[in-house]
Swiss-Prot record:
Belongs to the radical SAM superfamily. Biotin synthase family. The lineage of its organism: Bacteria, Pseudomonadati, Chlorobiota, Chlorobiia, Chlorobiales. It catalyses: (4R,5S)-dethiobiotin + (sulfur carrier)-SH + 2 reduced [2Fe-2S]-[ferredoxin] + 2 S-adenosyl-L-methionine = (sulfur carrier)-H + biotin + 2 5'-deoxyadenosine + 2 L-methionine + 2 oxidized [2Fe-2S]-[ferredoxin]. CDD domains: Radical_SAM. Homodimer. PROSITE patterns: RADICAL_SAM (PS51918). This is Biotin synthase. Pathway: Cofactor biosynthesis; biotin biosynthesis; biotin from 7,8-diaminononanoate: step 2/2. One of its GO terms (biological process) is biotin biosynthetic process. Binds 1 [4Fe-4S] cluster. The cluster is coordinated with 3 cysteines and an exchangeable S-adenosyl-L-methionine. Keywords: 2Fe-2S, 4Fe-4S, Biotin biosynthesis, Iron, Iron-sulfur, Metal-binding, S-adenosyl-L-methionine, Transferase. It comes from Chlorobium phaeobacteroides (strain BS1).
C-alpha cells in the first residue's frame, strides 16, 4: 500500500534539499496541518536540524542563567512577575555581588554547562552608569575564573556605549526578545516602551559583532498566523540563537488565567521555526518542564537543538543532571554527543 505525504510537506522538503528558508506561503499551509500529518512535519524539521544545525562536535546547546537583579521593574510586560504594574509575589533584590554570581556560575560549570547568562530586571542601560560598570567587572571576573565559559548577558535595552563595552569584554551572546509578531507587541506584551527600542538594541549589537539571542513567548493571546509573522521577523533581524518559551501563567499578572496553546500548535510552531531558520540554534526555554511535561522531548525532535537548564528568572526548572540524561536519551535520534 502506498501512503502519500501531505502536498505542503512535500513542498517543504525543499528546505532539506537546499538549506534555504521555507517560503512564507508554504508556512501558512503547514500551519493548518492536523492529525497524522503533524508527525511528518516534525520528522522533516528534525532532519533539517540534523543536516544544517549541527553544533560543535554534534552537541546540543545548553545554557543556564542567574537572575542577578530581581523585581522592581517599571515596564508593564503582561506575562512578567517582576513588573511593578503586576501583583505577583516575587523576590526583590538589587544587583547581586560578584561572589554570589561567580559561585552560581561555578555550580553550573561543574555540571558541564559552558554558557552562562547574567540577567537583570528593568528597562536597561541607555548609558554607562555605576551599576553597569559593576556588571562588566563581574563579566570579567567570570571569564578569569572560568576561561572556557561563554559568558552571556540579558540586561534590557541598551545604548551604543554599553553595547561597545560588552563587545570589548567579549560577551558571547546577548539576549533581548521581541516576544511576538511586531504589530502585536504593544497590546500583547507591553506599551511602556516601543518594540523599536529592542530592535534598535539588536542592530547595535550586530554592529559591534555581538551575536544576538532573540526569541519570544507562545500562549499570550497570539494566533498561529501571528506566530509565523514573529518567526519571519526574526529572519529579518538575522538572529543567532532563538529561545522559544511557552507561557507559564503566574498569579498576579494579567495573563494568570491564560489558556495554554494546544500541544499540536506548539510543536508545529517549533517545527516551522526550524524550517524558516535551518542553521540557527533554536532552544526551548520556559514551559519545557511544566507546560510540555512528558512531551518536552517531542520538541527536541521537532527542530530544537538547545535548551535552558537549571531554572528560569522566577520559576524553577529541572536539575542539570536530569537534563544531561535527557540529552543522552535524545542522542538516539541523531548523531549528537552529550558534551
Amino acid at each position: 500500500m502506498t501512503v502519500e505525504m501531505n502536498k505542503s510537506i512535500v513542498k517543504a522538503y525543499s528546505v532539506l534539499e537546499t538549506g534555504e528558508p521555507l517560503p512564507f506561503d508554504v508556512a501558512v499551509e503547514l500551519a493548518h496541518l492536523a492529525g497524522e500529518d503533524v508527525p511528518d512535519l516534525l520528522s522533516l524539521a528534525n532532519k533539517v536540524k540534523n543536516r544544517y544545525a549541527t553544533l560543535s562536535e554534534g552537541a546540543l546547546h545548553s545554557c543556564s542563567i542567574i537572575n542577578a537583579k530581581s523585581g522592581v521593574c517599571a515596564e508593564n510586560c503582561r506575562f512578567c512577575a517582576q513588573s511593578l504594574h503586576n501583583s505577583a509575589d516575587v523576590e526583590q533584590y538589587s544587583l547581586l555581588d560578584a561572589e554570589a554570581i561567580v559561585r552560581s556560575a561555578g555550580d553550573v560549570y561543574d555540571e558541564g554547562i559552558r554558557h552562562f547568562g547574567v540577567v537583570t530586571s528593568g528597562y536597561g542601560y541607555r548609558k554607562v552608569n555605576p551599576e553597569f560598570l559593576k556588571i562588566v567587572a563581574i563579566i570579567d571576573q567570570l571569564r578569569q575564573e572560568y576561561p572556557d565559559l561563554n559568558v552571556c548577558a540579558s540586561l534590557g535595552i541598551l545604548g551604543e556605549e554599553p553595547v561597545r563595552m560588552l563587545a570589548e569584554h567579549n560577551v558571547r551572546h546577548y539576549n533581548i526578545n521581541i516576544q511576538v509578531a511586531p504589530d502585536r507587541y504593544s497590546d500583547l506584551i507591553a506599551d511602556s516602551h516601543p518594540l523599536k527600542d529592542r530592535i534598535d538594541t539588536i542592530r547595535l549589537l550586530r554592529k559591534y559583532g555581538i551575536p544576538v539571542c532573540c526569541g519570544g513567548i507562545l500562549g499570550v493571546g497570539e494566533t498561529m498566523r501571528e506566530r509565523l509573522d514573529f518567526i519571519y521577523a526574526l529572519q529579518e533581524l538575522d538572529i543567532a540563537v532563538i529561545p522559544l518559551n511557552v507561557l507559564v501563567p503566574i498569579e498576579g499578572t494579567p495573563l494568570q488565567g491564560a489558556a495554554t496553546p494546544a500541544l499540536t500548535d506548539i510543536v508545529k510552531t517549533f517545527a516551522l521555526c526550524r524550517l524558516v531558520h535551518p542553521g540557527k540554534i533554536i532552544k526551548f526555554a520556559a514551559g519545557r518542564e511544566t507546560v510540555m511535561n512528558d512531551f518536552q522531548g517531542l520538541l527536541m525532535l521537532a527542530g530544537a537543538n538547545g535548551f535552558l537548564t537549571g531554572g528560569y528568572l522566577t520559576t524553577r526548572g529541572r536539575k542539570i543532571g536530569d537534563d544531561r540524561e535527557f540529552m543522552r536519551q535524545l542522542a538516539g535520534f541523531a548523531e549528537v554527543s552529550c558534551s
